[in-house]
Amino acid sequence: MPKNKKEWLTAIYRILLVLLGTFLVAFGNVGFLAPLDVNAGGLNGIAIIVRHFVKDESMKLLAYNLVVDVAAVVFWVIGLIFIGKEFAIKTLVASIAFPVATWFFSACPGVAGLTAKLGELITYTGNGPTAGNFLMAAIFGGVFVGTGVAITFVGGGSTGGVDTLVFIFEKYLKIKQSIAAFIVDGSIIVTGLCVLLPSDAAFLLPCLSGIISSFVSSACIEFIYIGSQTSYQVDIISDKWEEISKYVQNEIGRGTTVIPARGGFHGDDRIILRIVFNKNEYDKIRSYIATIDPKAFVTYTRTNAVFGEGFKSHKTENIFTKKRKKDGRK
């Protein structure tokens, strides 16, 4: 529980990010993917498969929303049982907000109006939607879903849903999250293909579009979430290491580490200057080194996350990372 005003404000900020991300995911599903049966996995894919068996057209939307509701609750309970209370708390907000957002956008006429204006992406006209309609729906849907998931991650939460299976696979089968996510979403897409394609060959296009949407979504998550965490570690061997160190400390505001080393070729004593900085400072440091010592030997290594003074607090570390450390895995 938050202990002071600052911690309360931080908690509220993170909850708002999770809510924003969840609503973006729901908007991408309801506004772009679901109307054209674009199955990109997740709860949306499960709901699309189930509503296929509902013959009454007037009941399909209700069936879609009910499946999302039930599945969200079921996966949350599964997470509570097999992963633990910490995971359940982490996904509680999204597990409640996602079904609510799905109902909201389903009932909101503005969503249909907006998507219809974007090249009639979800409107069946003439002989039906063209391949271009499916492609645009897959791209826009993937962008909204991927952006929403990334924002949820930035808020320190999780979208829940089928992600629960991903963490279960990681915990019990020791499968990496990226591979587990591919298996889970891939299984939903293939299931949709097997269920829908025999009844209507036209379902091949939305299923293939779902694969495209899944890649777009992953790219957005990589760009927004992973990209926002990117920092650099640089090792510098230079006769001007003292000047470089002072510049970094005084102008950039970063600390430096001086590491004694010995050259393997000549056997002379050298200094390796190590600096860790974020991507926004990359150009300044690189330009300064090139100016003061063009012959400096420099190696840049990109890191996905840095914890400690001047960077992220250890307290904000994701609970799933903590679990892996406790298990002795990296």
List PLM regions with ranges.
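Core subunits and conserved enzymes of cellular information-processing
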Residues: 2-240
